[in-house]
């Protein structure tokens, strides 16, 4: 998916 996980800067899931 296109988005950023909270707590992970620049880590896309």
From Swiss-Prot:
GO cellular component terms, semicolon-separated: extracellular region
Keyword Secreted: yes
Known tissue expression: Expressed by the venom gland.
Subcellular location as annotated: Secreted
Domain LCN-type CS-alpha/beta, chain residue ranges per copy: 1-13
Keywords, in A-Z order: Ion channel impairing toxin, Neurotoxin, Secreted, Toxin, Voltage-gated sodium channel impairing toxin
Lineage top rank: taxon: Eukaryota
Reported function: Beta toxins bind voltage-independently at site-4 of sodium channels (Nav) and shift the voltage of activation toward more negative potentials thereby affecting sodium channel activation and promoting spontaneous and repetitive firing. This toxin is active against mammals and crustaceans.
Family: Belongs to the long (4 C-C) scorpion toxin superfamily. Sodium channel inhibitor family. Beta subfamily.
Domain notes: Has the structural arrangement of an alpha-helix connected to antiparallel beta-sheets by disulfide bonds (CS-alpha/beta).
Name of this chain's protein: Toxin TdII-2
UniProt source species: Tityus discrepans
């Amino acid at each position: 998916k296109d988005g950023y996980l909270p707590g992970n800067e620049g880590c896309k899931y």
